[in-house]
């Protein structure tokens, strides 16, 4: 069975046993997380969420994404700015999908 969940403003299609990278969630490695913004479970489609459905996951690690370079330049003005950014991520392992 699969589910579509929403966390951090993004949607993810998950199945039991999947490992996904999501926007930072509170919790140390080994902590249990319950995601209740379930948009779809199997053939049930929520309006906007499926009532009573939840997805349980275990935090594998807290990590950081790859560095993104932000470069801004104004032409002919000798004006430029370069910044780097690394997003904080949480790596989750999906343990259980409950249809509710």
UniProtKB/Swiss-Prot annotation:
GO biological process terms on file: translation
RNA-binding found in the keyword field: yes
Pfam families in UniProt: Ribosomal_L21p
Keywords from the named record: Ribonucleoprotein, Ribosomal protein, RNA-binding, rRNA-binding
Tree of life domain: Bacteria
Gene Ontology cellular component list: cytoplasm; ribonucleoprotein complex; ribosome
GO molecular function, one term: structural constituent of ribosome
Assembly: Part of the 50S ribosomal subunit. Contacts protein L20.
Family: Belongs to the bacterial ribosomal protein bL21 family.
Function summary: This protein binds to 23S rRNA in the presence of protein L20.
Name used for this protein in its record: Large ribosomal subunit protein bL21
Organism lineage string: Bacteria, Pseudomonadati, Pseudomonadota, Alphaproteobacteria, Rhodospirillales
């Amino acid at each position: 069975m699969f589910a579509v969940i929403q966390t951090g403003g993004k949607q993810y299609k998950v199945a039991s046993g999947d490992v996904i990278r999501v926007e930072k969630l509170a919790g140390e490695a080994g902590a249990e997380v319950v995601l209740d913004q379930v948009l779809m479970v199997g053939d049930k489609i929520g309006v906007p969420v499926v009532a009573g459905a939840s997805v349980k996951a275990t935090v594998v690690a807290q990590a950081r994404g790859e560095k993104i370079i932000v470069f801004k330049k104004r032409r002919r003005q000798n004006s430029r700015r370069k910044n780097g950014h690394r997003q904080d991520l949480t790596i989750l392992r999906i343990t259980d999908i409950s249809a509710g």
